[in-house]
């Protein structure tokens, strides 16, 4: 060994007390044994809107503690005609609400969307929850006996505060019966389909078949001590209103803000959906592919099957077609002599006033080339130059034909319209499918009457993505960075006498062009506050809401 290194050790001061970094004193832990346990639930239809509810009762004299809940859901075989697929992460999107209760009341609960948000950075959990090409790609049935989807089982990890530090954070039963209750979303929320699919029959026959699994711990001579948990509370603002308020805030560890689109029962039909592939490019490619069959037509005469308002022109020999102030170049090879190439110049258009700006989807294409196949009677497109974006793909079909549009907005063929898809994904955020468009330009949070935080940029969203390693478009103020379990979480604390017991959020929505149909997508502000509770085991399992620093 090098002399310099040897001398640096020999010359060290031996009188200083030093900690051993080459070994630790092993401690003998509490004697326990874990086991995977599964049980079936009792199904009812007692939800607020006759939703299905599953209740699982856990009471075993040998189970001292539990955590890591996993819900198994069976998806049936799907047969029939039409286009059909499950929304990505279908297992999570089946869930409306989860609660864990004892005889003393609810211990912990969470909305389905917040559960999904908490697990969005766990790729394994997302995969097992129903993210696969077999489930999510749009499949087609051509006859009533065609199998569109094979039966499958998905597994939903229900992330709870009892999982944070395994045995330390586990929920101790304290000889109590624990009930886990899962409220499910309507079946319409978890499927994507076209109008030819017999959804009414599918909905009647669909039955949620859940099973709950968890890790149960048998512990010898357990010494139970009180602990703290965070419980999320969600408030949804009024439609298109920029404010939302969470009341009775006494000790909060974080506050999250995001927006959701509100489509209603008539605005959930869209032109396309990519299925399993979920990148922004996949949404755009699926949309462009659907439009091209109506946009460029090879026919032996003026195309038929379109509304009278459709403006379809024959492409001249030079291939250049002018649409208002834009030119589109079209070149299709191998066209038979008795046929011509036509371009649809007002496929989808929107405007709020005549003789003013018109949002015309046809104008977003600048060059289209391809080859016509006489055998298949279809055009194989080789190169498409366009400016279609994720917002275009996210426009509900109903907005093209809404009363706000002074033009005949949807001029596609009847055949194309029949392929439109009903999408009722309950966890969409923002105003586009990927939540790329940041529609909040300013955020202000007040605690009582005092301004707690304000921003003109998305810094709270950036920090949320960095800290959680997830990209879900949520803006979060975090008041607690204390290591969990071993310390009481840090909170923003109320002062009721000064009116500081509510968090009020106000946003300024980004300016958008009123001639763009996406401007008219209704939205709701969502605020989620994590309240701090103390878990006690004196007489069964119970929780107490923390009311201040001294609790």
From Swiss-Prot:
It comes from the Viruses. It is found in: Membrane. GO terms for biological process: response to antibiotic. Induction: Expressed in the early phase of the viral replicative cycle. The keyword ATP-binding does not apply. Pfam families: Pox_Rif. Keywords: Membrane. The keyword Zinc does not apply. GO terms for cellular component: membrane. It is a peripheral membrane protein. Its main location: membrane. Acts with RNA polymerase to initiate transcription from late gene promoters. Belongs to the orthopoxvirus protein OPG125 family. Interacts with the late transcription elongation factor VLTF-4/OPG110. Interacts with the late transcription factors VLTF-1. This is Scaffold protein OPG125. It comes from Monkeypox virus. The gene is OPG125.
């Amino acid at each position: 060994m090098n002399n310099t290194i040897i001398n640096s050790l020999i010359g060290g001061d031996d009188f200083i007390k030093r900690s051993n970094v080459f070994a630790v004193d092993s401690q003998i832990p509490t004697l326990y044994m874990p086991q995977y346990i599964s049980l079936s639930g009792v199904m009812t239809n007692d939800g607020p809107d006759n939703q299905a509810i599953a209740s699982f009762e856990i009471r075993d004299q040998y189970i001292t503690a539990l955590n890591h809940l996993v819900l198994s859901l069976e998806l049936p075989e799907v047969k029939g005609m039409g286009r059909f697929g499950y929304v990505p992460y279908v297992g999570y999107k089946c869930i409306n609400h989860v609660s864990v209760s004892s005889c003393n009341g609810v211990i912990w609960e969470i909305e389905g969307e917040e559960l999904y948000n908490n697990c969005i950075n766990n790729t394994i959990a997302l995969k097992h929850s129903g993210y696969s090409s077999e489930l999510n790609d749009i499949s087609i049935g051509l006859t009533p006996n065609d199998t569109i989807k094979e039966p499958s089982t998905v597994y939903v990890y229900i992330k709870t505060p009892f999982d944070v530090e395994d045995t330390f954070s586990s929920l101790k039963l304290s000889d109590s019966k624990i009930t886990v209750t899962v409220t499910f979303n309507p079946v319409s929320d978890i499927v994507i389909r076209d109008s030819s699919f017999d959804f009414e029959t599918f909905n009647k026959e669909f039955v949620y078949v859940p099973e709950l699994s968890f890790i149960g711990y048998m512990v010898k001579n357990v010494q139970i001590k009180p602990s703290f948990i965070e419980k999320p509370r969600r408030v949804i603002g009024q439609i298109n209103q920029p404010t939302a308020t969470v009341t009775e805030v006494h000790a909060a560890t974080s506050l999250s803000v995001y927006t959701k689109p509100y489509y209603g029962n008539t605005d959930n039909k869209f032109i396309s959906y990519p299925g399993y592939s979920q990148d922004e490019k996949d949404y755009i490619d699926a949309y462009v592919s659907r439009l091209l069959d109506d946009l460029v037509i090879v026919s032996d005469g003026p195309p038929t099957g379109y509304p009278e308002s459709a403006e379809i022109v024959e492409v001249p020999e030079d291939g250049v077609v002018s649409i208002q102030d834009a030119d589109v170049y079209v070149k299709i090879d191998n066209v038979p002599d008795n046929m011509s190439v036509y371009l649809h110049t007002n496929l989808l258009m929107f405007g709020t006033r005549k003789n003013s700006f018109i949002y015309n989807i046809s104008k977003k294409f600048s060059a289209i080339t391809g080859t016509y196949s006489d055998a298949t009677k279809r055009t194989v497109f080789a190169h498409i130059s366009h400016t279609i974006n994720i917002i275009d793909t996210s426009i509900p079909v109903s907005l093209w034909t809404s009363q706000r549009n002074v033009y005949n907005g949807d001029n596609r063929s009847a055949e194309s319209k029949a392929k439109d898809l009903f999408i009722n994904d309950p966890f969409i955020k923002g105003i586009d499918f990927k939540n790329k468009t940041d529609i909040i330009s300013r955020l202000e949070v007040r605690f009582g009457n005092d301004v707690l935080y304000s921003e003109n940029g998305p810094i709270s969203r950036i920090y949320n993505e960095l800290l959680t390693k997830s990209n879900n478009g949520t803006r979060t103020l975090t008041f607690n960075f204390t290591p969990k379990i071993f310390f009481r979480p840090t909170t923003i604390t109320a002062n009721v006498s000064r009116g500081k017991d509510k968090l009020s959020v106000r946003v300024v929505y980004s300016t958008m062009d009123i001639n763009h149909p996406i401007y008219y997508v209704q939205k709701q502000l969502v605020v989620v506050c994590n309240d701090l509770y103390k878990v006690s085991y004196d007489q069964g399992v119970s929780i107490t809401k923390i009311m201040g620093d001294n609790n």
